[in-house]
């Protein structure tokens, strides 16, 4: 390009800085988006204690095709008296879960919906889906575990457009009204809601 400018091609010479500016801008754009995206993501590792979780409703129906095949509809309530603040400095107060299970001897698929309430009144809506497995010990006692995925799909207030993805592990026993959950993952908010003051 230096040789051309010396031969009198001023038009090309004048365009050169402009073209460099465009190229530099295009090169930096993905870096800027990546930085903003990383700032908006919140890592989560949380536990829901069995002592503060209880099945408030359960309806079980025998399918009748093979022994032990049952369809169940359930409602689960969780409270969080000693919860840790999230990335917006808000604590959970309670969660209501409404779900379904399709089990044979407590093995099979379970899925449903959650509504998580925060201390400022905002709510987060979630879906969960996964598989339960039950092992029977020599003494006849059972241990049931659920492994699946929980997704944040929206909410209210600053969480209206929240999205999230979590690995969920649950140890449960519906007969003993016991349910203890562990979630690992992250959620993110649109840039327009980050930094908003609490309601």
Name each model-derived stretch.
Residues 1-11:
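Short, Lys/Arg-enriched N-terminal segments with co-localized hydrophobic residues
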Residues 13-22:
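Bacterial N-terminal signal peptides that target proteins for export
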Residues 21-32:
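Bacterial N-terminal signal peptides
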Residues 37-199:
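Beta-strand-enriched cores of mature, soluble protein domains
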